């Protein structure tokens, strides 16, 4: 994960808005393609974070993106306690969100509140490259952070692995990190596997004693082009969808 100790969520979210505005032209050819912004935070008051997101969502401005709050259940030595994921279904959704952000009083209130109750630990934009299943149906996720030297070859090998249908009980995806990524510490890509609930996750974890042939073949193919940085586990706290 991308760790920025001296920054807070208000300042960083303002900066990433500018970065994304400058980068938006890169999505002209793929304007119907979804992408996401990830904001990691450290907080001792998660209920206040939920309340702040409730208030912001109820204002429905700009109202063009969905928001998910994740709790980091196991993430090693990282200080991040939660991750805010903002999903844009297409480029126009983001442009409307960015253009309306400065005119939305609730946005300013949200940033001020978050400054008081949390500290931002990382931020980056992510572009899903492939995936399957409905992540909205999953509540627990295992996340693999990695540095990929040959993205095309890795994507092909990963697609073949996941198409076997035996590697993930729920949704899955491979995501390329964009603006904000820290390659040296956290790599260039992450993949996730979703589970309906913690019970399903534990069943899979406890029964995964012997790797499948497909997984063994996959490891052989990517051993020289992928460096695994970390394996984290996170759970959904709450989702907020745009109001119609």
Give names to the regions the model predicted.
Residues 1-12:
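Short, Lys/Arg-enriched N-terminal segments with co-localized hydrophobic residues
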Residues 4-5, 22-23, 232:
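Intrinsically disordered, low-complexity segments
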Residues 16-25:
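Sec-dependent N-terminal signal peptides
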């Amino acid at each position: 994960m991308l760790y920025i100790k001296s920054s807070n969520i208000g300042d960083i979210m303002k900066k990433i808005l500018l970065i994304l505005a400058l980068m938006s032209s890169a999505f002209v050819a793929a304007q119907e393609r979804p992408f996401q912004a990830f904001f990691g935070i450290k907080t001792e008051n998660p209920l206040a974070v939920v309340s702040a997101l409730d208030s912001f969502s109820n204002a429905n401005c700009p109202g063009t993106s969905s928001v998910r709050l994740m709790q980091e259940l196991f993430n090693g030595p990282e200080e991040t306690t939660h991750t805010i994921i903002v999903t844009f279904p297409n480029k126009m959704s983001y442009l409307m969100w960015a253009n309306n952000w400065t005119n939305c009083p609730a946005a300013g209130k949200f940033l001020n509140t978050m400054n008081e109750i949390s500290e931002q630990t990382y931020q980056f934009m992510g572009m899903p490259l492939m995936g399957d299943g409905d992540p909205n149906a999953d509540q627990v996720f295992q996340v693999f952070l990695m540095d990929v030297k040959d993205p095309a070859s890795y994507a092909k090998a990963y697609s073949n692995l996941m198409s076997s249908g035996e590697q993930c009980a729920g949704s899955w995806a491979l995501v390329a990190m964009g603006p904000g990524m820290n390659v040296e510490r956290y790599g260039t890509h992450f993949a996730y596997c979703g589970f309906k609930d913690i019970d399903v996750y534990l069943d899979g974890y406890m029964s995964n004693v012997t790797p499948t042939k497909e997984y063994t073949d996959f490891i052989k193919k990517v051993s020289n082009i992928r460096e695994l940085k970390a394996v984290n586990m996170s759970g959904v706290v709450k989702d907020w969808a745009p109001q119609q």
